[in-house]
Amino acid sequence: MKRYRYFIITMIVIMTMINYIDRGAISYAQEDIIKEFGFDTIAWGSILGYFGYGYMFGSLLGGITADKKGPKFVWILAGTAWSLVEIAMAFAGELGMAIFGGSAIAGFGLLRVLFGISEGPIFSTISKTNANWAAPRERGLLSALGLIGVPLGALITAPIVSGFLTIASWRLLFVILGILGLVWVIIWAKVFTDYPEDNKKVSEEELNDIRSTNESLNVEKTVETEDSSEKWYHFFKSPILVGNMIGYFGFQYVNFLILTWTPKYLQDEYHFEIHSLWYLGMIPWIGACFTAYFGGQMSDWLRKKTGNLRIARSYFAIAGMICAAICFLIIPFTHSIVAVMILMMIGNAFIFLPNAVYWSVIIDTAPNKTGTYGGITHFFVNTATVIAPTLTGILVATHGYSTMFISAVVASLISIIAMCFVRPGEKNMSRH
């Protein structure tokens, strides 16, 4: 097969779609869960935020392990773990009441933390896989293809989960989603290898294409040429990597804000029932499905056209976040549901436009440490997965839903400022 790497990327897309359906399912099941266990808005925000505590540590450990043990080991371990935890989520309330003295929230909290730990390694492992399987000239494209499952998964979560909940219980939903994850793990174990050199399906022609340095820029590094003696703590001496991490934080804050709170926002502010959310919940993610893909292509096109990674990565990300911030700033002053949904869709589309950039910067700068540096990046970035849902619960309870979008603007501005200091691919300053 001449393009087996694209089959591998397709499998990753399927996995990230399952991954994001798993994450988003609880937001659509919130009405039934809240009604059954009596959670208030602040408690519910905390439950959503518990995921992030585990996610931070899972991403850090997963990235380091991917460098040491290889991405295949991490994929199989993490995929099996999160699928089993997803099944256990069906019994979270009962677990809490049985073990933690009648506290249902403790049961949900524990399993949300475990769910976060097991899902945490995924994106740093995607980055490690791309570093091993992608030629330098297509890093932006393959990163975008690998990440397109995020908005696609969020998009189809709305009709799948909302439709399912109209005919069956939220408990059965979690069980079925967990089983789907286990099926993916079984297939992946048979088709994937850490390096294309180890895979019988990869032809010599394709391998030469992957390892080719044709069209590479002078500042770009490859798996073979980059100094592998670099230590994990060198990350914090690199303004490139630290700035990129802060920029990515802004993206992740807005991403999780929309993923976790949109269903409840629509139900509370506009009084929509669950059967209406199957299509309304899709709208914010429609544009993102296109921009997540074309953003990677546009970044690689700018790289080729200008020969300047700062323009192709940093300035490109800044432009997208500026446009997103403008959209979210307008929403609190808009009272039409049609206008609100359009602005959410456009704003989220611009947020996802540079999604692949944050991972491409790591690969461009330190391909041999992509797993470790990706894990460190994701650890700090994923503080947003705690802060966004938890802070939103507090803001909504005290000041209303308009503050939810103001916080998205602030997060976007943080990202914009940070990316101004990112010069991708330049010689790592960590040893100087």
Give the ranges of each region predicted by the language model.
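C-terminal transmembrane helical hairpin of 12-TM major facilitator-type secondary transporters
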Residues: 310-357
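Helix-loop-helix hairpin linking two adjacent transmembrane segments in secondary transporters
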Residues: 150-199
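Extracytoplasmic gate region of multi-pass secondary transporters
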Residues: 26-27, 236-293, 355, 359, ...
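A late C-terminal transmembrane helix in Major Facilitator Superfamily
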Residues: 363-398
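Cytoplasmic helix-loop-helix junction between adjacent transmembrane helices
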Residues: 111-150
